[in-house]
Amino acid sequence: MALTLSTTKTFTNINCSNNTSNITTFKPLKLPLFWPWQKVKMGPLSVSPMGFGTWAWGNQLLWGYQTSMDDQLQQAFELALENGINLFDTADSYGTGRLNGQSERLLGKFIKESQGLKGKQNEVVVATKFAAYPWRLTSGQFVNACRASLDRLQIDQLGIGQLHWSTASYAPLQELVLWDGLVQMYEKGLVRAVGVSNYGPQQLVKIHDYLKTRGVPLCSAQVQFSLLSMGKEQLEIKSICDELGIRLISYSPLGLGMLTGKYSSSKLPTGPRSLLFRQILPGLEPLLLALSEIAKKRGKTMPQVAINWCICKGTVPIPGIKSVRHVEDNLGALGWKLTNDEQLQLEYAAKESPKSMIQNIFQTR
């Protein structure tokens, strides 16, 4: 399912540096220079070193989605494909109210209609997440949720089927049922690989061991991971992933937009995000200053620097995209590496900043 591209193709919007300094702050990893056609392994899959998230597609409450945006979303998707991105993350719960599932529907439509994928739709790696709704009480119901996602996506097989969150803290018996559902999806060939989202260190090890006894490898673990989310628990999750051969997918690599440099205490986003920004932004001055300094020195933007840091840590970040401009900017995070000194500068600045991202309430221990 990996997207195969000719290395002679001209790629736009990607700046390149020959700097390949070693990384010493985390467990050393052998990494490519992050060109999108130099895929990284994610279980049995080969994916671009950065994917794109589609949380905003259909979300009116937080991201202000309107159906009039669909054309620009499709243009953004096409540009991502043209530049070698083949990993797209979604969820069966993405979309608000009557638009529930809209993200999957749009992604499926764009894949089917893509001019660059004529007869090759299966080369896109779709990773979707299944919500642990309280009415999904049997493994069969969880498998049916997977089939419903396949219908909305108009595809026969998922790249990665993911459990959206753990129910261990409030419904431990349901948790075992959902794990069995993941196994059945894999055994029935509905998914090429399975993953989890919002799993803390303890539950991550438990589900890995459970799946191993069932003969199913755990491909990926998706958590909030960024310069704003690099606390003790997140680093422990990353260490476990490295040890067990699980690829960490980092969502919200830009901290819901706080690391873009677009906002300040006097310039806040509209909607519910403004409440969070009002709490956190005033304490981010050291980190934002470091991002700005490195971006200016490198001829990059602050988002490109923040995303590149995630890639340097061996994760696959999935920034959200809502426009061609977002894709163009995010693609500039590829084709170069932060030096070790630059990474240390950012990490020190993050620690010096008195505020960090609030932990997702769905993440368990």
From Swiss-Prot:
PROSITE patterns: ALDOKETO_REDUCTASE_2
Enzyme class, first EC level, given as a word: oxidoreductase
Main localization (coarse): plastid
Signal sequence region: none
Effect of pH on activity: Optimum pH is 6-7.5 for the reverse reaction.
Pathway in which the depicted protein is active: Cofactor degradation; B6 vitamer degradation; pyridoxal from pyridoxine (dehydrogenase route): step 1/1
Cellular compartments annotated: Plastid, Chloroplast
MF term (GO), any: NADPH binding
GO biological process, one term: pyridoxal biosynthetic process
Catalytic activity: pyridoxine + NADP(+) = pyridoxal + NADPH + H(+)
Domain of life where this protein originates: Eukaryota
Transit peptide: 1-15
Key words, A-Z: Chloroplast, NADP, Oxidoreductase, Plastid, Transit peptide
Tissue expression notes: Expressed in cotyledons, embryos, flowers, shoots, roots and seeds.
Catalytic residues (positions): Y94 (proton donor)
Record-listed E.C. numbers: 1.1.1.65
GO cellular component: chloroplast; plastid
Primary role: Catalyzes the reduction of pyridoxal (PL) with NADPH and oxidation of pyridoxine (PN) with NADP(+). Involved in the PLP salvage pathway.
Summary of subunit composition and partner proteins: Monomer.
Additional notes on this entry: Mutants with reduced expression of PLR1 have lower levels of total B6 vitamers but there is no reduction in PN or PNP levels.
Sequence similarity: Belongs to the aldo/keto reductase family.
Annotated protein name in UniProt: Pyridoxal reductase, chloroplastic
Source organism of this protein record: Arabidopsis thaliana
